[in-house]
């Protein structure tokens, strides 16, 4: 059997529970045709780069699948008939990714809780520049400044 990564986008107005039900429907199709789903990742609701069928956001879900091509074809056919699925993409891969996907790792990296204060970064005045002149506010207002 071949290995696949399948990502589908569900409409923003369906609940997370309905997205889980969709995933279970896909699992049933795959398993009935002799395959299995190795991993399911729900990435949450994300903003789309452009509108798809009048939706600006969508639920993203990743499935790692080990199944024959006939099972994938049937799952894609059922997905395209479902009005809650906006887009889908299935890619054949050589090996399934172990652990979290890049999107889930990105979510963990976004915390940035341990960053120090950036401030002036410990730099002093630049020796290659002379000191700044004091600003003359009266001259700036006469010249039509803001």
Swiss-Prot record:
Matches recorded under InterPro entries: Ribosomal_bS6, Ribosomal_bS6_sf, Ribosomal_S6_plastid/chlpt, Transl_elong_EF1B/ribsomal_bS6
GO cellular component term, pick one: cytosolic small ribosomal subunit
Keyword Acyltransferase tagged: no
Biased composition (Basic and acidic residues): 105-138
The protein's role, per its UniProt record: Binds together with bS18 to 16S ribosomal RNA.
Similarity field: Belongs to the bacterial ribosomal protein bS6 family.
Protein name: Small ribosomal subunit protein bS6
UniProt source species: Methylocella silvestris (strain DSM 15510 / CIP 108128 / LMG 27833 / NCIMB 13906 / BL2)
